[in-house]
Amino acid sequence: MDGTFDAGFREPTISKANRWGREMVVALKLGWPLIFTNLSQAALTATDVIFIGRLGADTLASALLATSFYHTLMIFSMGLVSAVMPMIAIALGKNRHSVRDVRRTVRQGFWSAIMIVIPLWVVLWHCEEIFLFLGQRPDIAARSTDFMHTLQWALLPYLFYIVLRSFFAAMEKPMWTLLVAALAIGFNALAGWTLIFGHFGFAPMGLHGAGMATTASSTMMFLGLAFITLRHPRFRRYHLFGRFWRPDWPRLIELWRIGLPMALTFVFETSIFYAAVVMMGRIGPTAMAAHAVAIQIASLSFMVPLGFGQVATVRVGRAYGRGDPKAIAYAGWSAYALGVGFMALMGILMVLMPRVFIGIFLNLNDPQNLPVMELAVTFLALAALFQIVDGAQAVAAGMLRGLRDTRIPMLLALFGYWGVGLPLGAVLAFQFGMGGVGIWLGLAAGLGMVAVLMTIRWRRHLAHVSAVAAA
């Protein structure tokens, strides 16, 4: 958070109970479309995993290797352009009709997407050398690379979609993104089923078909939101695509100043999960396939606190923009409570009914899947242990982004994930012979450390803005 907080806002006195209740209602109203939008995004990947899983364990392992690497780079670039969200929220907090400010930010979000995606395309095209360097089997590395050569073209339209999604979220109108994402699920499922297995006259394309379906779906999502911004009277007045070619260097620099630490924070978190995939690959195909199933389930539940983290970014950002310290606290803690509460419930369900979740991704009646299923049950029980802290760190990070605090949280994430989580997981897995279980315990420890550190930093910010308001 910078030192420009203006505590000039004074709101009529409202009881604490009413304030908490009102903020909870607002968080839920804004949050559920964001949550289901996140789930829709996860469902696109989950649909591909379900289809590809029917092609065999080795093919699933190849897809996991490729998508894990792709998503690591995608998350980095997505984190960069997601700086659009707090910047717009703060601008609207200062002035509800900041048309020019909003337009400048969105345009530079598009510019940033183009700037970052070109070098990433080069890296993705040559990923086979990276996979072999990391010790993956040559046959799996080759299949993963073939998959990547179709999947990578989804990146640019997806980043454009993220820019517009951030715009709609900051405007507190996320229903449009939910509508587009929901339509994309059906489109991706139909396209994947058609191209992967060969229907409606198409030859079976396997992994290539999955990549083509994802690229087409990402393009559809961007075009859908772009159409709404161009046609809807509420958004058309921003002229987001007008004079697109004009540079705006001050705004571009500001976006990168906020967004680059966000991008690195996202990468530190997601890359530790990619490192876990690499370590699982060294243990064996069974561990890797079981990890693929368990991590997919955990990722789906994570979409809920991620949504409440986005709510926190918008609500905290707007309160920060208008200089209201009490609203900052209520907005942040309300989203925090909702995110952590949901993850606690999901952790209980993962322990009580793991086979229900696993059966979505594996045929439980196939004897060949029994070793994978048994190991996935164990991994899912361990995932339940870190559900609460995972939710806490996700929402706390969103709260801090609403204050434009991204650099120190980046360092906290680096320490927690790579200073604690990964080394501990590697030692437990390979030095103490715990295998995949040790890797999952390390992940839990890293998430817990980040959650504690970010929550402490948030509390310090609250103390600071309260002191400024009282001065």
From Swiss-Prot:
GO terms for cellular component: plasma membrane. InterPro entries: MATE_fam, MATE_MdtK, MdtK-like. It is a multi-pass membrane protein. GO terms for molecular function: antiporter activity; xenobiotic transmembrane transporter activity. It is found in: Cell inner membrane. It comes from the Bacteria. The chain crosses the membrane at residues 30-52, 67-89, 110-132, 147-169, 176-198, 208-230, 255-277, 287-309, 330-352, 372-389, 410-432, 436-458. Its main location: membrane. GO terms for biological process: monoatomic ion transport. Keywords: Antiport, Cell inner membrane, Cell membrane, Ion transport, Membrane, Transmembrane, Transmembrane helix, Transport. Belongs to the multi antimicrobial extrusion (MATE) (TC 2.A.66.1) family. Multidrug efflux pump. This is Probable multidrug resistance protein NorM. It comes from Brucella suis biovar 1 (strain 1330). The gene is norM.
